[in-house]
Amino acid sequence: MWFQTLNLTLTKSPVRCFANGNPPREDNEEYAEAEYEDLVKRTFHLSDSGNQVLIVQPYVKWGSGKKRNTTPELQLAEAVALIETLPKWKVVDKLVLPLQSFHKKTFFGKGNLKMLRDKVRENEKIVSVFISVNELRGTQHRELEEQFGVPVFDRYMIVIQIFREHATTMEAKLQVARAEIPYLRSRIRDYQEGALERIGTSTAVIGGDGETFVDVRRKIVGLREKKLKQELEKIRSNRELLRSNRTRLQYATVAVVGYTNAGKTSLIKALTGKTTLQPKDQLFATLDVTVHEGYLPSQLKVLYVDTVGFISDIPTELIEAFNATLEDALLADVIVHVCDMSHPDLSAQCETVTATLRRLDVNKNLLENMIVAGNKIDLPHQLGPDMNLPPDITRVSALHNTGLNALLSRIEKSVLAATGRVSMVVRVPAGGSEMAWLYKEVAVSEVISDSEDSQYVLMRVVISEGQLGRFKRLFIDQ
């Protein structure tokens, strides 16, 4: 007999135990896949039937943990927006709660815990609770679920739900799966402890070679992580090849970053005139890092890199899972940071983006020269507390094309400085080989006849040092 079963009340399906510690070879991958999917489903409480949620926005009243660039009410509004982004999810009730810290075993004090427990029990519409903090500790999560008797979510879990919903391409799905790994790993020990408490023992050997429940789960997660890394490495290699081709062709790249739903895709659509881009008014609408061709006022071709949006109060590991594609943005020549000028929590959102870029080790010079574009100026402004925006912010409306010329001029100036290009006027014979070479190799923004000699033209071009050297060797230093 190849295996026996040990039923743990934490899982609906039995945990299979093998006499030699390993399943039959032909069943190994299938078994690991099924167990991994079961682990993900239970850890993140995945369901196709939707949810009805009580949202609790905790905040620290004073001390070092107090947030000073936002308010609990604005944080709660974002928590509501996160839930409303998910299909079939509804907010049943919501509240803010002041706490001394987020470190208690039960997260809340006795009074607040009882109040919340009673609220959940008395309202049958509440079938889950969302505690809007970046990540609950395993012990806190287990305690709260035992107290409330319903699934409990933190921000990491909710963002993963949204990522799963919005991931459509293979690249995005692989990176979402990679983003799940750190959370799964942090929960495995708690996953075991919860089961062991129910079967009343301190250890559970489920493999013939002495493997415990947690050993098997770690191995399953490790196998999936290894597989994901291999697939993502292929993506990274392909993107490196594309980047090297762009470098060879001397294309300048402009990364467009920002808080989720700040209007990054809308701005790229406005800057490039690409009607095929379809921005969506929702959080994390873009999970794929995509590249779009555009032209600066000098007719220099640039590539705009659209990126996944950032958000506050989630671990950096969640965003780092998208490194395979984020590298396109991190290695750009210029960064444009898009802010939502109409958002009441504008200051906090801008600070979140800058802090996230620092944690992702973006080049210091790139950060210092980052262009800030204040989008959505066509909407009513609701400036929040302690506004601290860059004095040289360029205000635009991607929807109405307001301020785009000023923004394009700033982008052009930064691109020229970052790539060593210069704008200059070159006098060449009209219709000659020099003129043809310049049209083919560099950006030409203007051509006028030479007023002193009609056989010549004056060409305003944007040219790199290398291109200028080649031009001189071909046509001047002969």
Where are these predicted regions, by residue range?
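Conserved C-terminal guanine-recognition region of P-loop GTPase G domains, centered on the G4
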Residues: 42, 68-87, 117-124, 132-151, ...
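Conserved nucleotide-binding/hydrolysis micro-motifs of P-loop NTPases
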Residues: 60-63, 99-101, 134-137, 158-161, ...
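C-terminal-of-GTPase-core extension/linker across diverse P-loop GTPases
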Residues: 14-54, 186-262, 266-269, 273, ...
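Conserved beta-strand segments of the P-loop GTPase G domain that flank and frequently precede/overlap
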Residues: 55-59, 94-97, 130-132, 337-340, ...
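Switch I (effector-binding) loop of TRAFAC-class P-loop GTPase G-domains
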Residues: 246-252, 270-303, 311-324, 355-356
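Short alpha-helix plus adjacent loop in nuclease-associated cores
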Residues: 157-179
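N-terminal accessory targeting/assembly segments
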Residues: 2-161
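Flexible beta-alpha connector loops of hexameric P-loop NTPases
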Residues: 64-70, 103-105, 166-167, 276-278, ...
